Amino acid sequence: MPIFSYPSSPLIPTLTLLLSLPILFFLGPNILPPRRLTITAPDELDDLSLFQKAIALSKSQSAPKSHLPSTKSRLGSTSTFRPKIAFMFLTNSDLHFQPLWEVFFNKTQPNLYNIYIHADPSIRIKPPTGVFADKIIPSKRTQRSSPTLISAARRLLATAMLDDPLNAYFALISQHCIPLHSFNYLYGFLFDIHKLRKNLDYLSYIEILSESEFLWDRYNARGENVMTPEVHFDQFRVGSQFFTLTRRHALKVIEDRRLWRKFKLPCINVESCYPEEHYFPTLLSMEDPNGCTKYTLTRVNWTDSVNGHPHTYYPPEVSPQLIHTLRESNSSYSYMFARKFSPDCLNPLMEMADSVIFKD
């Protein structure tokens, strides 16, 4: 039997709660998982309006060919007879490697490419300059492990299709990507191969894999069998988030409604949720598998990935030998881009831009 006893009082739990609130305020974001972004109805309607305009324009015109007459871009640039490459930068931070990309673009004719930037509007980003100036498209928030990254890529595709009918290839680029060859080398690779194929359709360069130890968990990330009947497990694919698509495949992406209904659903198992790595490979594998190479032009090192992020290269690793190694592939083609590089790699990369990177 206790010698002393204290009267119970509601004051003690009240004080405890009040003292806990500041702690929860400061530590909560680091303890609780972030709320996943979902696709809102207004955002969906905005995108559908954009997609419908791009679809209507694309279907009213022929696919870009070398004999097309000169046209004028909706952003004001004058097009030429030759097909173009649309470089689409998807970023949620500053474009740290803009100076390197400037060298890449400045070594070729400005009428052979267009640039489009989707920059997360919730993050303050240093305004791009030079050839990147005024290239940010109307953008919306993005978040990892959410369908917003799919929406951003589709938004870029539709904008580029609507802007210039001569955009024949659409290369999705990360802010952590660097070029591994000159623009002329890339251009020749994409379009000379087309000539060698005797005017057959262009091929899309997108990784499409049907085997992965995590595939089943990712397929059920939204709940068991939620993806059916639109996508059965044997149709589910995985691939790189970054790709180089033909115009006809870009059109298929923005026309799609059926698969999007499932891929836009929020994930229950966030750790297995990488929608952007599955939507594009799955859709194009189902729609036109023979029109895709099933490999990407972007080299990524997954040997020591951390929390779903690939190996990040730092300045001590940057060398001419690294560039030559990153170009190598298991096929007859060469990789054209590489990621992931830390921002402080810019200086050593710029030092060997002319002598190594753009010397093909």
Q: Which role fits each region the language model picked out?
A:
Residues 1-360:
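ER/Golgi luminal nucleotide-sugar-dependent glycosyltransferases, focusing on the catalytic module
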